[in-house]
Amino acid sequence: MQNKERIRYYHSYTDDFAQARDQNYTVPEDYKWVREDFFSRLLSVLIYSIAILFGIFYCSFGLHVKIKGRKKLKAMRKTGGFLYANHTQPIGDVLNPAFCAFPIRIYTVVSPANLSIPVIGRILPYLGALPTASTMSGMRRFTEAIEHRLSQKKCIVIYPEAHLWEYCAFIRTFPETSFRFPKAYKKPSYCMTTTYQKRRFGKKPRITIYVDGPFEADSELSGKAAAVKLRDDIYNCMCERAENSTYHYIEYRKTEEHKA
């Protein structure tokens, strides 16, 4: 019998199951997406290195992660690029892309609400968090930060599903908005699909991550059409990989299925 504590009901794929302290938080006008003064760079190296060391143990022994296809990202060392992923782990989604892309440094597009989390919110910028902006001037500096990191041949991580659904074993549909970047900056795209399998011992599943790509934006299509096609290519690939999920540790059901 399914454990009711592990059934979650949703109205739409934009429902939030993980709430930050302030979901309406916006980045201030003086926010710095790129911090390259000596102190900030030193702090970033230290915090990122500690996160990697912590992640080795947490992902290997806590989440039981196995990565397949990691070598496909090797080519990104010469170009930089984008890595799209499904959003299903609160801590793992911070660490797993770093392992997949290593030794390439990652910078992750995040909701500004994450910056409102006590303690962690102050650390996130030094881990490479790039919060989205709500103003025109903020969006300009946000995209300039992405362009700057790509010029350094870094990896930009994007979770197009946008909302964290812990242990979700299927791919939620997502818009093409974030898929305009690869064509605009002429960079390759990859995808990272997290899947779940039952372990012989223990309640929580084993995680298998599949890395696929590169996917190239169609140069003959307009910006929107190219973004739609790239989105479809990556979405279909992720859905195919998600079929390797054989265990639903948390089951997600639409509200119509909920019976009092």
What are these regions (language model features)?
Residues 75-136:
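Catalytic core of membrane glycerolipid acyltransferases/transacylases, capturing the structured
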Residues 71, 137, 195:
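Residue-level "edge-of-site" marker
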Residues 46, 50, 137-138, 226, ...:
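Soluble or luminal CAZymes and related metallo-dependent hydrolases
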Residues 67-70, 117, 140-143:
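Structural motif corresponding to alpha-helix initiation and N-cap regions
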Residues 1-25, 142-260:
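Non-catalytic C-terminal accessory region of glycerolipid acyltransferases
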Residues 1-82, 92-96, 121, 126, ...:
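Membrane-anchoring hydrophobic helices of lipid-metabolizing enzymes
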Residues 63, 135-140, 171-172:
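A conditional alpha-helix N-cap/helix-loop micro-motif detector
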